[in-house]
Curated annotation (Swiss-Prot):
Organism, as annotated: Listeria monocytogenes serotype 4b (strain CLIP80459)
Protein name (database record): UPF0758 protein Lm4b_01560
Gene Ontology BP terms: proteolysis
Molecular function GO terms recorded: metal ion binding; metallopeptidase activity
Xref: Pfam families: RadC, UPF0758_N
Matches recorded under PANTHER family: DNA REPAIR PROTEIN RADC, UPF0758 PROTEIN YEES-RELATED
Family label: Belongs to the UPF0758 family.
Start and end residues of each MPN domain: 102-224
Coiled-coil boundaries: none
Short motif JAMM motif, span: 173-186
Domain of life from the UniProt record: Bacteria
Keyword terms, alphabetized: Hydrolase, Metal-binding, Metalloprotease, Protease, Zinc
Length: 224
């Protein structure tokens, strides 16, 4: 069925205007993002094909632009729009979660970063910056690539911590393999960060390694 064959009230844009965004199905939301179909297929048909490709809508956030382009009817332009919408939603979610979040234990912090780090294909070194009440005041990815002591320099981490007037920091990095077991380099980086924090008066509360749906707290394991 082509889009002009659908009744006006059932078209995604008109449905949104009449009933609100919550009334739209996931396929209809995707249809609004990609905007147009092809000569032979409606935008809703293509959008539904995208939804069916993944086990659930949440899986879309881990797809690459190339994976979206494997769907018949999706080229680079439409795939880019989908990726942009997903990334915008992710960033909004980060800001919302960050507001007045108090970190009382490693699990609190992991809930904040796990969605972002668990399924990345490269190692990312990420920091949370906290105030004296252990509230998250800022977060940032500091390094991307293999974690080693020559790349992760405490100077870069604590320069930002001082700029944000942080009282303490929590560091994270992911293991793309999914296994959060620390390497010797992980432990060396942690030791250097803890020592630098003691010098500048900003405590390293923890260094947590993120795997696929699991993590290891180096503080809890007694590594520093």
């Amino acid at each position: 069925m082509l889009i002009h064959e659908i009744s006006e009230n059932e078209k995604p844009r008109e449905k949104l205007q009449n009933y609100g965004i919550e009334a739209l199905s996931s396929s209809e939301l995707v249809a609004l993002i990609i905007e147009t179909g092809t000569k032979n297929e409606s935008v809703l048909t293509i959008a539904n094909r995208i939804i069916m490709k993944f086990k659930n809508v949440g899986e879309m956030q881990y797809a690459s632009i190339e994976e979206f382009q494997l769907v018949n009817g999706i080229g680079i332009a439409k795939a880019s729009k989908i990726m942009a919408a997903i990334e915008l939603g992710r960033r909004i979610g980060i800001v919302t979660e960050q507001e007045e979040v108090v970190v009382r234990c490693p699990e609190d912090a992991v809930k904040l970063v796990m969605p972002e780090l668990a399924f990345l294909f490269q190692e990312h070194f990420h920091c949370l910056f906290l105030n004296t009440k252990n509230q998250v005041i800022y977060r940032q990815t500091i390094f991307v690539g293999g974690l080693n002591a020559s790349i992760v320099h405490p100077r870069e981490v604590f320069r930002l911590a001082l700029r944000k007037s942080a009282a303490s920091i929590m560091c994270f990095h992911n293991h793309p393999s999914g296994d959060p077991t620390p390497s010797s380099e992980d432990l060396l980086v942690t030791k250097r960060l803890a020592e630098a924090g003691n010098i500048v008066g900003i405590t390293l509360l923890d260094h947590i390694i993120i795997g696929k749906n699991k993590y290891i707290s180096l503080k809890e394991k007694g590594y520093f």
